[in-house]
């Protein structure tokens, strides 16, 4: 994969919006997973912390930790895209992410569900500050992170 053009402005938009969301992680973690289940109710079975629950648990530390990881890694990816022109995640981290997603039964369309939930959560959290530029920056960063994980999953399969 060649170098990706990710601007300083895009990086700043991702970082600034993440700072806003970080101020109420419990709320936005819950919103994020509620969105995933609204878009794809069957996805519930992919998350160990959701399987045995009829609703998204409010005070589940695993739920919060997973949501934070998705947002934080996407934010870090934005920084890497701007600085390096590519996703720079440690091989061991990518191997782990590829392995865990493969074992959990995650397939390509699931990444789109997570992306849509991520964007809906950003829209909810940012209110009037959410716009096409913010959406585009987060989308591009997330797409590259998802591609890196999917590539690792394919390598693990073969």
Curated annotation (Swiss-Prot):
Function: Phytoglobin that reduces nitrite to nitric oxide (NO) under anoxic conditions (e.g. during flooding or in waterlogged soil). May not function as an oxygen storage or transport protein. Has an unusually high affinity for O(2) through an hexacoordinate heme iron because of a very low dissociation constant.
Cell location: Cytoplasm; Nucleus
Motif (Homodimerization): 38-42, 108-120
Entry EC number(s): 1.7.2.-
Pfam families xref list: Globin
Keywords carried by this UniProt record: Cytoplasm, Heme, Iron, Metal-binding, Nucleus, Oxidoreductase
Signal peptide residue numbers: none
Recorded catalytic activity of this chain's protein: Fe(III)-heme b-[protein] + nitric oxide + H2O = Fe(II)-heme b-[protein] + nitrite + 2 H(+)
First-tier enzyme category under EC: oxidoreductase
Binding site for heme b: 48, 62, 66, 101
Designated name of the protein: Anaerobic nitrite reductase AHB2
Cofactor binding annotation: Binds 1 heme group per subunit.
InterPro entries noted in UniProt: Globin, Globin-like_sf, Globin/Proto, Leghaemoglobin-like, Leghaemoglobin_Fe_BS
Subunit structure: Unable to dimerize.
Domain Globin: residue ranges: 5-154
PANTHER family cross-referenced by the UniProt entry: LEGHEMOGLOBIN-RELATED (PTHR22924), NON-SYMBIOTIC HEMOGLOBIN 2 (PTHR22924:SF92)
Similarity comment: Belongs to the plant globin family.
Lineage: Eukaryota, Viridiplantae, Streptophyta, Embryophyta, Tracheophyta
